[in-house]
Every structure is written in structure tokens, then in C-alpha cells.
Amino acid sequence: MSRIDRLADQSADAGNRVYDWMNARFDLDSGRKFLGKAFPAEDSFLLGEVALFCFLLLVLTGMFLGMFFEPSTSDVKYEGSVAKFQGEEVPEAFASVLHITYDIPFGMFIRRMHHWAAHLFVASIGLHMLRVFFTGAYRNPREPNWVVGTALAGLSMGAAYTGYALPFDEFAATATGIGYNLATSIPLVGEVIGKAFFGGEFPSSATIPRLYFIHVLIIPIAIGVLLAIHMMILVRQKHTEAPRDDDVRGLTPKGGQPTDGAVTSDGGTESVVPKEDDSVVVGLPAFPNQTAVSAVVFFLTLATVAMLAGFLPVHNIAEYGPNNPAGTPELIMPDWFLMWVYGLLKLLPSWMSFTIPVVGIHISTEFVGGVLLPTLVFGIIAVWPFVDYHDKSVHFTANPLDRSWQTAVGVAAVQFIMIASIAGMNNLLGRALGVGTGVINPILTVALFVVPIGSGLLTYRILEDSTEQEHARQYTEQAEEADDD
């Protein structure tokens, strides 16, 4: 045996001893089993990975921005590159964002990446939840993961809101003031919430530090914990899978060498997996196949965010200028994912503001439209798996066309959010049509109820008729086959 061969054997023995030592303490064999876990080859399942990678990009770009951002409303003399503010006293938070944008190398690009990653994060979570809803992937035993996903959707919106409040320009300050008014409108505990989240009556010197703390620590930790819980539940329960058209044939028996055959959830392969058998998942092994797919998704997500950052500008704080308590921007609108809440605030009539007799608790339209109704919407979403409940565990996804009333409810809900979002842009709509908001708002109020109900009923009727026609066709075919026999 050559010296090189002896060294190779010694290295292998040393490696085995190290692995045995680590395995005895950390159970590495269970990790090796996970590497063979099956992931269905479904493109729509990758939306969850897009959300995960967007969160990673948000953390990385946020770390860069956090090194230069100053969470303070104290006035400082601006001495940066923007000529219009040269030598003026501006809030330190505003000055630091100008410094990041115009003076730090790649600062504008990183800020844009952070912005678009946030939008893509919210969008991918929303699309992921729509996919899960319409395919019934929330059913038993996956109700807990649906609740976790709902919480993630709410936290993603909260992270975005606290983020665009930080520059403390005129737009951000106005949006922050709206949030403060909504928080303090909550009966009994409003003032406490206002002090906890906004540092007291707005504007306050504690507002930006408080929101910054929530934005960079509280919400990211909560999102990270929920993502970890989401992934642990997913690994424990295994993926849902689309119904199979036929039995899936592998190339080796279960426990054999890895092949391109029917990979199952236990990390092995089976010679035949019956199409009705949902106890195993047929798909790609976590390593190396799914890992390679995930790597491609990551780089595509990174490329998409980078392309958006390179070509599309973001909120121009230099145009709005620093916070001016005596003024209000001509046009204030939230980001698209909060537009529906803004629309509800605009459509609610003033008579919905009232005081409850005897107890003297005041209920304002701000509370109803900006807090109560959005909370009700998220509450309904969270408990939906318990409304559409199944005693038996379901591991195959469903065809939305075969779920008449569930699909109808989903269509109606989407229409409700869309109409409410349009109401949030009633000023722009009025300008485009040449009419005032006094004309548009009553129409939108009626549409907010009529359109969702009408579209839901129409969807239900169409799907029911389609199902009846399919049953009639199958009955006719069976009758013809019986006659032939």
C-alpha cells in the first residue's frame, strides 16, 4: 500500500471517528434522513420559498441600512449632497436617510432593494395563502400552519408600516399620525397602546426610536420564530401533493440506492406508489434535487429584487421634505397591501361613531374601519380551517373547481379586498372620471357589498352547474357501457 493510500485510509478513519462522536451527541443520522425527504415537484409550492428568501434579503439589506440610520427626531444641520436642504435644520432621521440615499456608495440601491424585497415579501405570502386556500391545503392536519401563516401575513404588513414611518419625512409623518389615531381609537386601552407603540402623543420625540425598535427587533424576531415554527410543522407533517393521475413506479425497492424513481416521504423509494396512497409523498429528495431548485429560486428572487431596485425608484423623501406639523401632503395613500384598510376608513359613514349608553364607551369610525374590521378579516381568515373542517386527515390538494362554496367564498373575499382598495384611491378615481368623492363614495359603498356577494353567488352557480353536467356525463357513459355489456 502506497503512502498516499495509507494517508487516505487514516483520513477516512479520522472522519468516521469525528462523525461517530458528533452523531452520538447530536443525532446526525436523523439529519441524513431529512436529506431524503420528498418535496412535490409543484411550481406553485415555491411561493413559500420566495417569501423566505425575501425575508433573508430584508434582514441583510436592513443590517446595512441600520448602520447609517439615526432613529431620532432631533434637529440637526444638514450638510449632505441635496442642495435644497443644505444648511437647514432637519430631523436627524430624515438627514440620515438622505445621507444613505445620496452619499453612501450603493446606499440608494440597497435602500431600493430593501423596499422592493418588502413588497415582494408581502405579495408572495399573499399568493402563497391564496394557493393554499383555493386548493384546500389548510385542511386537517394543517390548521396550525394556516394560523401561523395568517400571523406572518399580519406581521409582514406591520413591518412594512413601521419601516416607511422611519424617514420622518412629511409623507411618513402623516402616515404615522394616522396609525397613532387608529391605535388611540381603541376603547379602554387606546391610550396605553399609543404610549407603548408611539411613545405618547404624536408627534413625540420617542415615536421614531419606538417604531425603530419594533421594526428592527420585535417584528423580525417574531417573524423568524413563526417561520421556524412553520418549517418545523411542515417537516413534521410532510407536504401536500396534487392528486396523481396514475400509480407512480420507481426503479428500486424501498431502502435501496437513491434513484430517479418515486421518492417517498421516508427518504427511500418504492417500486410502486398507488395513486390513491396519500401516506407517502412522491417528489424530489431534499438533497440534492430540491436544494438545487431552492438555489435557483433564491437567485431568481435576488435577481428580481435587484432588477426592480435598478430600474424603479422608491419613495422620494427629498421631494416631500422633512416633517412639517403645520402642513399635510396633497395626496396621501398607503402601500397597496394596506390600501383596503384605508378604503374602509374612507367609506364608513359618520353615524358609525357613537357612544355606548350606561358604560359611556365611545366607538369611533376610525376604530371600526381601521381596527375592528381589519381584525375581523384576519380573524375570519385564521379560523377558516375550523369552518371548513374535516375529521379525516387530507394530504392531497383539491381542485378549486370541485369545491363550489369554498371557491365562491374565496372569490367573494378577493373582490371585497379589491373594492375596498379601489375606495382607498377614490381621489385618483374621481380625478380620472372628473367627479368628486361625494359622488364616488356611495357607489363604492354599495359595490363593497354587492360585488363580492354577486361574484360569489355567480361563481357558486357556475361551478355547481359544471359539477352537475360532469355527473350527468359520467352517468351517461356508465349507462352506455352497461348497455354494451
UniProtKB/Swiss-Prot annotation:
Region (Disordered): 244-273
Annotated heme binding sites: 114, 128, 215, 230
Organism: Haloferax mediterranei (strain ATCC 33500 / DSM 1411 / JCM 8866 / NBRC 14739 / NCIMB 2177 / R-4)
Quaternary context: Probable multiprotein complex; a catalytic heterodimer of an alpha and beta chain is proposed to associate with additional subunits involved in membrane attachment and electron transfer.
Protein's recorded name: Probable respiratory nitrate reductase subunit cytochrome b-561
Compartments, record wording: Cell membrane
Gene Ontology molecular functions: electron transfer activity; metal ion binding; oxidoreductase activity
UniProt xrefs under Gene3D superfamilies: Cytochrome Bc1 Complex, Chain C
CC cofactor: heme
Primary localisation category: membrane
GO biological process terms on file: nitrate assimilation; respiratory electron transport chain
